[in-house]
Structures are given as C-alpha cells and as structure tokens.
Amino acid sequence: MRNGYKRIAMIGLVALAAGCANSVSVRPGAEVTRFHLGNNPARGEIAIEPLDPALRGSFEFSRYAAAVERQLATLGWRVVQGSRSEQVALVRVEQSTREAMRRESGFSIGLGGGTYGRNVGIGGGLTLPIGGARAGQIVVTELGVRLQRRSDGAAIWEGRAQGEAVAGTPAAARAAAVDRLAVALFQGFPGESGRTIRVR
C-alpha cells in the first residue's frame, strides 16, 4: 500500500513539472522604442561600427552588422567600409536570461535601464514577473542602433528592440535574434519618437 502511495505521489510530481514546463510564457514579437528629432534622416553613405571598440573586426560583430546593413540598404543608405562616411551607425547587442514564470502570474515590476557608453540614450532593462512557479529560462536579446554624424557626434536617430525566446531553441541564438530585432527596429522607419510599441 505504501508503494502505491509513493507511485501516486511520483505521478503527481511529474504532472506538476510538466504543467510548469508548458506554462513558460515568452512575450511575442519585439518591444521597440525609437528617438529622433521629427525629420526623416537624409540617405547617403553610412558605416556600421560597434559601440564597443573591442568588437571591431570580429566575426561576431560582422553578423550583427550584416543584419543592420540589410535594413539600412532597404531604406536607401549605401553601407561603406572605413571611416570616410559622414554618417555612422553604432550598434550594440546585449543578451541575458531571466527565469520564466507561470503565465498566470500577471503582475510585474518594470526595472528601467539607463544610457549606454558614449551617451547613447537607448533605454534598456527587463521586466521580471512576480509570483508563479519557476519553469526554465528565457533568453532576452536587445539590439540598439544609433545613427549619428561622424563630424560632431550628433545623434540623427536612435532606437532599441528587445525580444525573448526560450533558452536552448534556435530562436534564442544571438545571430537569429538580432536578425529578427533588426527587422522590427527599422519597421516603419523612422517611427514615432519616444513611443514604445510591440512589433509582431
């Protein structure tokens, strides 16, 4: 009889674990915020450079730059190499994980971010739900791009896009995530300044 109780208890634990795994919630699409002065930037030659100089010339950054280049080319820019262009796109990619919570939670506290190096005013931060059971991890990827003049460093346009994926899935890979975020970030360019939207 005691073994029967143990078996029932084990079945219950397995069912509970399965229920938690199935309740992992990933926010769909990308959260996008853009900032600009209200005018549509003039197109021309532009170079794509990492916000972190240590990434310059790296294979990792070349994959991010390619995603941004595709979007800029679609919008009418001509991407060039080197430092001869007056316009430059500074690119930043950050990735972290958070514990996924049960879908029923429904209550969260937004942890606001700040500015990043070189006074790039792109907000960051994560929203961490409160309550609910642990059910794995979510990978959070953020892409930030700042278009500026090389001569004086003045910002022309800047924005950030943040998306989520379940850890261990192809969608959570950095390169794949940046590809999706670049499309979302430049959709409807230049976008409404100062407004955060969700692009699906």
Q: Where are the language model's segments positioned?
A:
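Surface-exposed short loop/turn segments
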Residues: 92-152
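Envelope-exposed proteins and targeting segments
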Residues: 42-44, 64, 75, 85-89, ...
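Acidic helix-start/capping segments at beta-turn-to-alpha-helix junctions
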Residues: 80-100, 200
